[in-house]
Curated annotation (Swiss-Prot):
Gene Ontology annotations of biological process type: L-methionine salvage from methylthioadenosine
Protein name (record): Methylthioribose-1-phosphate isomerase
Catalytic residue list: D244 (proton donor)
Catalytic activity: 5-(methylsulfanyl)-alpha-D-ribose 1-phosphate = 5-(methylsulfanyl)-D-ribulose 1-phosphate
Pathway(s) per entry: Amino-acid biosynthesis; L-methionine biosynthesis via salvage pathway; L-methionine from S-methyl-5-thio-alpha-D-ribose 1-phosphate: step 1/6
């Protein structure tokens, strides 16, 4: 059985509440844009691709059964909702780019006098629904492209390391970095996968471990602080992580802890790959210094499962992401191939 983080059909949207995993698997309804914003902000759904899809599908739910007198009224409502949704989590670029695409489509339909109000609404709904389908096909391509690079010239199974959660729970299905690992396993060339717990929100322990156990992959959970010791004591063939935003020069914002893994990988001579769809690449940002880093509430650091683990009164710094410099990245695995960071901007412009 395939894991589904997102269930959608005919204007009805449900998401798997990832705050409850792995103890409980519960789907919750998303009845409109406010629910979508809340689910994204509270991290009931997370992962840059999934955030974009849920955000846009919540817009579909919002407008699905409504009637509009004019195309302008529909366009204004869509614009307001999209502007609101992109404030839910600022670092992941996928939702912003998806919102920009929808806005561009709306402007085009608004200018086309042959398109009716209902026709305009249906075209927008159709385009957003296609995002769900396309994300899965893109992830499959990312998995294949990554596996091709990792197994090239290798005559033995691989040991791989990943961080945070980049699988079916972070996307429409299959996953990005975890999709690469799945693809390696499908070729019977995966010896073992290690996943970090990913403090402070424990997406690795709660979600990635959940997916690995579900898929019956040979896997071991380690703490974030064990990565250097792991690379030093056991032969790790490659590290594969996801991305929430990739700048034009290849600098990559991903879950906090990614940067230190890349530094340690460089020291030990372990290839460090980023797996991300083109929707995570933001060529409008020159380099990582311009990426806005979201800071999360203190209680996410001081509490686990509602129980305080830190001394009351201690100050906290809780950035959700860090930026890995492009020079530490071996390659960026996309649905259109594996690229060197310096090749990104040109490849995106060729779309």
């Amino acid at each position: 059985m395939t894991l589904e983080a997102i269930k959608y059909k005919s204007g009805q949207l449900q998401i798997l509440d990832q705050l409850l995993l792995p103890a409980e698997s519960k789907y919750i309804p998303v009845a409109g844009v406010k629910d979508g914003w809340s689910a994204i902000h509270k991290m009931q759904v997370r992962g840059a691709p999934a955030i974009a899809i849920v955000g846009c599908l919540s817009l579909v739910v919002e407008i699905y059964d409504k009637q509009y007198e004019t195309k302008a009224a529909l366009a204004n409502e869509i614009g307001e909702h999209l502007q609101y949704l992109v404030t839910s989590r600022p670092t992941a670029v996928n939702l912003k780019l998806a919102a920009d695409d929808v806005k561009g489509q709306v402007e085009s339909l608004l200018a086309n006098e042959t398109v009716t109000v209902d026709g305009m609404k249906q075209e927008v709904i159709k385009a957003i629904e296609y995002m769900l389908e396309k994300d899965i096909s893109d992830n499959r391509a990312i998995g294949d492209n990554g596996a091709n690079v990792l197994v090239k010239g290798v005559d033995r199974p691989l040991k791989l390391l990943t961080h945070c959660n980049t699988g079916s729970l972070a996307t429409a299905g299959y996953g990005t970095a975890l999709g690469v690992i799945r693809s390696v396993n499908e070729r019977n060339l995966l010896e073992h996968v290690y996943c970090t717990e990913t403090r402070p929100y424990n997406q690795g322990a709660r979600l990635t471990a959940y997916e690995l156990v579900h898929d019956k992959l040979p896997a071991t959970l380690v703490t974030d602080s064990m990565v250097a010791a792991l690379l030093n004591s056991r032969k790790i063939d490659a590290i594969i992580v996801g991305a929430d935003r990739v700048a034009a020069n290849g600098d990559t914002a991903n879950k906090i802890g990614t940067y230190q893994m890349a530094v340690v990988a460089k020291h030990h001579g372990v290839p460090f790959y980023v797996a991300a769809p083109f929707t995570s690449i933001d060529v409008a940002i020159e380099d990582g210094s311009h990426i806005k880093i979201e800071e999360r509430p203190e209680h996410e650091l001081t509490h686990i499962g509602g129980q305080r683990i830190a001394a009351p009164g201690i100050g906290c710094w809780n950035p959700a992401f860090d930026v890995t410099p492009a020079e530490l990245i071996t390659g960026i695995i996309t649905e259109r191939g594996v690229l060197k960071p310096c090749e990104l901007a040109e490849k995106v412009r060729q779309k």
